[in-house]
Amino acid sequence: MAERESGGLGGGAASPPAASPFLGLHIASPPNFRLTHDISLEEFEDEDLSEITDECGISLQCKDTLSLRPPRAGLLSAGGGGAGSRLQAEMLQMDLIDATGDTPGAEDDEEDDDEERAARRPGAGPPKAESGQEPASRGQGQSQGQSQGPGSGDTYRPKRPTTLNLFPQVPRSQDTLNNNSLGKKHSWQDRVSRSSSPLKTGEQTPPHEHICLSDELPPQSGPAPTTDRGTSTDSPCRRSTATQMAPPGGPPAAPPGGRGHSHRDRIHYQADVRLEATEEIYLTPVQRPPDAAEPTSAFLPPTESRMSVSSDPDPAAYPSTAGRPHPSISEEEEGFDCLSSPERAEPPGGGWRGSLGEPPPPPRASLSSDTSALSYDSVKYTLVVDEHAQLELVSLRPCFGDYSDESDSATVYDNCASVSSPYESAIGEEYEEAPRPQPPACLSEDSTPDEPDVHFSKKFLNVFMSGRSRSSSAESFGLFSCIINGEEQEQTHRAIFRFVPRHEDELELEVDDPLLVELQAEDYWYEAYNMRTGARGVFPAYYAIEVTKEPEHMAALAKNSDWVDQFRVKFLGSVQVPYHKGNDVLCAAMQKIATTRRLTVHFNPPSSCVLEISVRGVKIGVKADDSQEAKGNKCSHFFQLKNISFCGYHPKNNKYFGFITKHPADHRFACHVFVSEDSTKALAESVGRAFQQFYKQFVEYTCPTEDIYLE
């Protein structure tokens, strides 16, 4: 070891690259090999020098800085190395040592400094190993260091970082939170940056030079940005760049001969040891903007381009984060914008070079640990998923206009405030043109498979059957009837489960399908007619229940009355409401239905139907035209008058009419909305008159009176 050191120190012109002890620091490991805390020395194995570097915490950043400074670049090409350059390097080393003077063992460092300067003088012999003269606090670590030889990398252990108080507990910065620091202590730069001794080298720092003490920040900067700068390291990229950009007279990339083999062994061992000690210094790679003399960053793949905007040493590289105290908060916005603009592609050239307001691509790489990277990405992807769902909601909101789920309590129907109805144009065009043929068993406009994919609210429940799709649960509010073989038949049962047929004679059922049961077998199978599909077949009896019908005496009273009023209107739809009466409930339901129907008014106009008002109830039938009567299968929907709780027209636009019905068995209510070319006041008065007659007949039947004649 003495011969090698004397050759390295006193070589003079024979070995120009070895004139300064700091020349080989930047190639301690290959360019593609990254360590979180690399303190290995290539040209020296001196225990005292290694211990000083351990105490000062010299890591990748400082070694890169010492080897990349332009004022010292002359050492790479000078013959014997100037004494002034060596003095500047020694002063920088002393500053690093003085910066940690308030830590335990600072008085002991002065003795090591004298030995170190004596070892660096040209022609000096190897430094003395004085383990017996070391203080008690350093005895154990020094004795371990002296037992190592040049090839004893297998027994090398870090000595000082575990005993010095170099890592005070300070509040976590936003950057360490973003990088998933699992209880990691801050690096030594935090303590150095907050120290009272500034940089005393007396030289002007180049504008783009990386200074590990302050990172191009003024000394009076606060501790929070200093912490961010201290935890960011771009040394893997810059070290490989500096190695390739070195002048021809610079040091080789790897030592020759068997020295390189032992050096590789030591580096491999250090990788195993130092990765376990990452709880002391936790460094993550950050993409640094290229200097004027450096090529574009092609050493890192695109996925390793950057970890956090707040840890970048050059604020000008990401102008979008200017003025924001916590740039990492905008990572949700980044995922939001990236998803909303899928056509953006990453520009060539390795890392992302974004302009103002343009976010980077979502994939991020973390070289710290697999578990932290997975946890970070899972949270990120969860946020992205949440933002993407919000995107879909926002994209549909312009279609709905002023629709909102909280409109149940709305009392003003703004869309009806205008003089003309939003459906007047569509209604006028439809009456001018030939009437469109409707399916025989379809009065519902609930859904059509050939329509555009429009998402409706789940609260919009249509009353009528649809021959093209399954029916909705609001159909159970009334009774379905159709003409079969010239005779009108009402439904007797309602399907409560979906039944998929497995044989040819079985009948397919959907929930709430109206059924006319014709035969009930002893094996609990029904033979029935599905009024929605017009098919016949058998199905299990427990898949349907019997509908509630009016009592026979009420049906007899209704038959005795031949009073019926008919009105031609257009059915808009039905919606379930929370209350059974009230103008505010009626207006809110009209607003919801009208807003939703406005999406389909052009390609699926409202159904033309006939409202028949009688003492028995309200019947909604298909418009009586030739095209429908030719089908021979006229269908209608019937609501018993006793189940109608409220009706009326809109106070601001009397062309809209609606009535609220109660479910025959459940405590549920639905509002059915219609629109007409003319005023619907007559329709509302007709329903009121039907109520009066129904009440009169009901009272006469339930409370009969006897005439008492007094003599």
From Swiss-Prot:
Residues 471-660 are annotated as: Interaction with VRK2. A motif (D-box 2) lies at residues 364-372. Residues 283-471 are annotated as: Interaction with MAP3K7. GO terms for biological process: JNK cascade; negative regulation of intrinsic apoptotic signaling pathway; negative regulation of JUN kinase activity; positive regulation of JNK cascade; regulation of CD8-positive, alpha-beta T cell proliferation; regulation of DNA-templated transcription; regulation of JNK cascade; vesicle-mediated transport. Residues 267-277 have a biased composition (Basic and acidic residues). Residues 157-176 are annotated as: Minimal inhibitory domain (MID). The modification Phosphoserine is found at residues 15, 29, 40, 152, 181, 187, 193, 195-196, 214, 311, 328, 330, 340, 355, 366, 369, 407, 409, 444, 447, 469, 471-473. Its main location: cytoplasm. Residues 14-25, 139-149 have a biased composition (Low complexity). Residues 162-182, 194-204, 228-244 have a biased composition (Polar residues). Changing R160G: Abolishes MAPK9 interaction. The modification Phosphothreonine is found at T103, T205, T411, T448. GO terms for cellular component: axonal growth cone; cytoplasm; cytosol; dendritic growth cone; dentate gyrus mossy fiber; endoplasmic reticulum membrane; mitochondrial membrane; neuronal cell body. SMART domains: PTB, SH3. Residues 105-116 have a biased composition (Acidic residues). It is found in: Cytoplasm; Cytoplasm, Perinuclear region; Nucleus; Endoplasmic reticulum membrane. Residues 561-700 form the PID domain. The destruction boxes (D-box) may act as recognition signals for degradation via the ubiquitin-proteasome pathway. A chemically synthesized cell-permeable peptide of the minimal inhibitory domain decreases brain lesions in both transient and permanent ischemia. The level of protection is still high when administered 6 or 12 hours after ischemia. Belongs to the JIP scaffold family. This is C-Jun-amino-terminal kinase-interacting protein 1. It comes from Homo sapiens (Human). The lineage of its organism: Eukaryota, Metazoa, Chordata, Craniata, Vertebrata.
